Amino acid sequence: MTSEQNVFGHVLDILEKLGIPYMIGGSVAAIAYGEPRLTLDMDVVVKMDRDKAKEFSESLGQEYYVNLDSILEAIRSKGHFNIINSEQGIKVDFYILKDEAFDQEEFSRRRKESFDNIREATFASPEDVILKKMEWCKMGESEKHLEDIKGILKISGSKIDLSYIDEWASKIGISDIWNKLKST
């Protein structure tokens, strides 16, 4: 097991222990459904309130750089915060669950998948990972996200609900990116 997996697993164990609903997205989720690649951080969407923020911060202890005020501000603004493992410099980015329709739908579709040889974890669905990565492409950060999408389609393509992606790509304004990907 890599040092990243150890750190990520420890953080996931804390979320589970505290009963904080979460969902892994980003490159870690893309790797779970697609092709392996190097990643040095993990993106996690959380549904966290102020009380849980304090418990979470305290549970991380001295092993992590964590700023409770940053967590509380992220909760207030529906923004994001991060923690960094103080020994290895490994980062976990947390995004507070937003109220937008797509974000709520994505969170409702999360699923348990194997994370490592020790545990299962809650991931965004492969369809939702594809949609989020296309949103990032729309914002200008494209190459690695496009490669992740192609990897998911290559490895998990037969299990992907294409009509769901068609529907949400249209609703969130990324059909042009999706149509280009489907034609390649």
Please report, for each region that a protein language model flagged, where it lies by residue.
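Compositionally biased terminal segments of proteins
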Residues: 1-184
